[in-house]
A protein has these predicted regions:
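Protein kinase glycine-rich loop
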Residues: 32-38, 43
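Glycine-rich ATP phosphate-binding loop
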Residues: 44-70
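Conserved N-lobe beta3->alphaC-helix segment of eukaryotic protein kinase catalytic domains
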Residues: 65-94
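Activation-segment/catalytic-loop signature of the eukaryotic protein kinase fold
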Residues: 105
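Conserved short submotifs of the Hanks-type protein kinase catalytic core
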Residues: 111-122
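Activation segment signature within eukaryotic-like protein kinase domains
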Residues: 146-147
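Conserved small/polar residues in nucleotide/adenosyl-binding loops
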Residues: 229-236
Length: 240
């Protein structure tokens, strides 16, 4: 029977071989810029590198880099957190025109990277553009289209027993073609019927201004109401 020391040596050799065979992220993608950050990591805009290292006519992606644990200035990988596993698992199962799609998952040393399709804008940017630049409300026909597409994506999530739990303008992405994509499934959870109030068996999550009755109280309401209000009135909820 192998000893724990020999088993550890075998695993170390396996990890070394596996890591040597992996291409570094920067050998596969050229980072074009920083997009956003959150509790668990940062998101970057990147362009795919083709075989010769060129980015001509290459596809553009959004790469989410998860933060690793730090211990006295040394980064340590203490296994993959439950939230990361949940986000990866959910995104791999979701395939819908109004949900941001996951392209691939990469690991490099102590970091995990999720490579998503890139979407040009988020609704918070659209709000700011209309409030501070155009100084006029969003056209009613456009609002109807955005809300319809948003509801279409939500219907798909709920049909698969998934609750987003952090729906807000910054997580509603819009392409240059006007296609709405629901993004950031980091706080999403599979739920059951009947709906259980969030405080009964889970820590309270969701951006504070968008905490909805169905999450806090198990009520028959939905965050879409607050998001639709923002569509129609332009100010974000926190400024009301």
């Amino acid at each position: 029977m192998p000893t724990s020391a020999s088993a550890s040596a075998v695993m170390s050799a396996y990890r070394a071989t596996r890591n040597a065979q992996r291409k570094p992220v920067l050998a596969r993608y050229e980072v074009l810029g920083y997009l956003s950050s959150g509790t668990y990591g940062r998101v970057y805009k990147a362009k795919e590198l083709v075989a010769n290292g060129s980015t001509t006519d290459a596809r553009v992606f959004a790469i989410k880099k998860f933060k690793s644990d730090k211990n006295d200035d040394a980064q340590v990988l203490r296994g993959i957190s439950q939230s990361i596993i949940r986000e990866i698992a959910l995104n791999r199962e979701l395939h819908h025109e109004n949900i941001v799609s996951l392209h691939e998952v990469l690991q490099e040393k102590t970091s995990i990277f999720l490579v998503f399709e890139y979407v040009d804008h988020d609704f918070l940017q659209i709000i700011h553009h209309h409030v501070f630049v155009l100084r006029k409300p969003i056209d009613g026909v456009v609002v109807k289209s955005l809300i319809w597409q948003l509801m279409h994506g939500i219907e798909y999530l709920h049909a698969n027993w998934i609750m987003h739990r952090d729906l807000k303008p910054a997580n509603i992405l819009i392409s240059n073609r006007g296609v709405v994509k629901i993004g950031d499934m980091g706080l999403a959870r599979v739920y059951s019927n009947p709906l259980v109030p969030l405080y009964s068996n889970d820590m309270v999550v969701v951006t504070i201004w968008y905490r909805a009755p169905e999450l806090l109280l198990g009520a028959r309401h939905y965050t879409t109401g607050t998001v639709s209000y923002t569509h129609l009135t332009l100010p974000t909820i926190c400024s009301v």
